[in-house]
Structure formats: C-alpha cells, structure tokens
C-alpha cells in the first residue's frame, strides 16, 4: 500500500528521484508507473486474505485508508492554487500520511487479543506519528540538500505546494506572507528557496514548527504510556527513530 501511493505520488509531483533512485515514471513513463502502482495496490488484499482472523474487517479498512489517502492527496493538489491554514494543512497530513500509519497500528489490534482493547490508542498513536513524519519532511526539504533527502527538495516551491512552514507563515502574518510571495515570483527556484528559508528562520516559523513537533511527540509519549508495558520500549524506540530522522 505504501509503495503504491509513492509511485502515484511521484507521478503527480513529477519527481525524478525517490531515495536517490530514479522514479518509475521517469525511468519508463507515466503509463507504466500507473500500472506498477495499481499492481502494488492489488497485492495488499492478496496478503490480507492470508490473515486468519478479522480478515474482512482488515480488508475493509485497507480500502477505507486508500480513499482517505486519495482525499488527502486531493487536498494537496487543491492547495497548489490557494492558501491553506495550519488547520487545513494538518487535516491534509492526517489523511494523506497519518491514515496510513494509523492503519498499520490498528491492524495489530485486529490480529492479536493482546492489543484489541488498545485499538483506539494505537490508531491515535499511528495518526500522530504520520503527521510528525509529514511535518518533518517539510522542514527537512527546506533545511537540507537533495542528496541527503534522496529526492528533489525544491519541487514543493516550484508547484506551490503548501507545507507546515507556508501555512504557519500565512497564519502568522497574512499580509507579510502575501508580500513575500509576490516579491519572489520572478526569482529562480534556488533563489526562491533561499529567500523563503531566510524568512522562515527570521520570522520564527521554523521554531514554531519545531514546537508543534514537540507537542505531537509529547502526545505520542502520553499515548504510549497507556499501552501495555511490554511494548513501551519498542514504541518509544520507534518514536525516537521518527522524530530524530535526518532524511
């Protein structure tokens, strides 16, 4: 499911690299990439069919998550032509990324009696981890290199995609943000990125974004404390891997 969405995402974003590997649509063409993505998506139900319990429930959730990811991606594309508030950004992130993490955590409660009573906590933990992951992507793409990220880091600017940084800048000072957007319009892509990076730092947007990450991290830790003691270490390790990632 994850790889299926990435293949289609690369087509829509016209990205040339994914983890420093040429994307499928770039190596071949869009038609072959669509087929590859569809094929990967079809593998999910085949594997789910081999699960011995709650198979139908998991299959239904699998398809519900695909719909939710599509909703999130539709928001992402819509926001290319208009501003998006922080609340709208978080809704988009919860759907396009958080829903996938949530599904992975939820399945554990559906295949094991040990975690069934913690289904709602696991779902909430997964969704918040997904939002953290998406916010980090936005910050890293602004602050690090394409080589480090393994993909282009200027495509969001080129396509006028909305990130946590742009949404926070909008909510922080709508007039200043509109003025900056107008000012950078005729500059090169790299110059735009440098000017945006300077603004995000000088106006405190980066600090606010990191503050949001800390709040989400605390929320995840609080949820982990509600889960069985036997998985506390594993869940905290996973949280640390996600919040401390550099690419």
Where are these regions (language model features)?
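Mg2+-dependent prenyl diphosphate-binding active-site environment of isoprenoid biosynthetic enzymes
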Residues: 1-178, 214-215, 240
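Solvent-exposed, charged/polar functional surfaces in cytosolic regulatory/catalytic domains
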Residues: 43, 219-226, 241
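Alpha-solenoid HEAT/Armadillo repeat architecture
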Residues: 49, 171, 185, 225-228, ...
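Short, structured helix-loop boundary elements
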Residues: 59, 119-122, 193, 206, ...
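A short structural micro-motif
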Residues: 65-68, 128, 186-190, 202, ...
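Mobile late-domain/C-terminal helix-loop "cap" segments
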Residues: 177-224
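Short, amphipathic C-terminal "tail helix"
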Residues: 229-247
């Amino acid at each position: 499911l994850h790889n299926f969405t990435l293949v289609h995402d690369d087509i829509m974003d016209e990205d040339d690299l994914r983890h420093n590997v040429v994307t499928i649509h770039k190596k071949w063409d869009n038609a072959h990439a669509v087929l590859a993505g569809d094929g990967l998506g079809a593998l999910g139900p085949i594997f789910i069919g081999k699960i011995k319990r709650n198979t139908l429930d998991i299959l239904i959730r699998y398809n519900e998550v695909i719909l939710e990811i599509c909703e999130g991606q539709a928001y992402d594309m819509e926001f290319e032509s208009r501003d998006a508030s922080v609340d709208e950004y978080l809704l988009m992130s919860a759907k396009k990324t958080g829903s996938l993490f949530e599904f992975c955590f939820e399945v554990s409660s559906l295949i094991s009696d040990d975690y069934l009573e913690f289904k709602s906590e696991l779902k909430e933990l997964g969704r918040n981890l997904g939002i953290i992951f998406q916010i980090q992507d936005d910050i890293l793409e602004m602050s690090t290199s394409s080589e480090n990220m393994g993909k282009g880091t200027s495509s969001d600017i080129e396509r006028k995609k909305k990130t946590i940084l742009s949404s926070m800048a909008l909510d922080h000072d709508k007039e200043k943000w509109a003025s900056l957007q107008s000012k950078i319009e005729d500059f090169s892509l790299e110059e735009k990125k440098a000017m945006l990076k300077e603004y995000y730092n000088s106006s405190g947007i980066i600090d606010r974004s990191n503050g949001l990450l800390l709040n989400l991290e605390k929320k995840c830790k609080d949820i982990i404390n509600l889960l069985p003691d036997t998985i506390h270490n594993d869940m905290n390790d996973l949280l640390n891997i996600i919040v401390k990632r550099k690419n």
